[in-house]
Amino acid sequence: WGLVTCVYNLGFAAFLMRTPDSDRLPAGAAGLVFFLLLVTEFNDVAQYVFGKLLGRHKIAPTVSPNKTWEGFLGGWLATGLLIWFAGPLFTPLAGYGLLVVAVALPLAGFAGDVTMSAVKRDIGVKDTSHAIPGHGGVLDRADSLTFTAPLYFHLLALFALGKF
């Protein structure tokens, strides 16, 4: 399971670098990867900030006790807006395709975060590191990416097919 998560799912981000350069890619293949990393990490931080500022209602208390509905919804909205406004600068997405990505990617990031939290709890790893205060370790930085990378890749293929 760990091999699939780390190699297969995260491999989608690396595969984006093989996208041929085109005038339809505003920032090139590297821009596609940068945008994925930007919105995934922004979503994590936005959920954390909204949760700390407004969080009252736990969303998954047994798996991730610090996650709240307020953090989830605030992060989802903030990240969706970031995708909507910054997406055209980095991707060939527009209109309906961009809207789908703006709605779906923050949801996938949250799902990846909660799923990896559940896996860590199952194997008895409570905290992976204290390297980034308030954010845990490397696994905590990449957990959302395990779900956002394949989704982003396939949504790009679906909505921008023939556009890059």
Cite the ranges covered by each PLM segment.
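Hydrophobic alpha-helical transmembrane segments
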Residues: 1-47, 51-61, 68-164
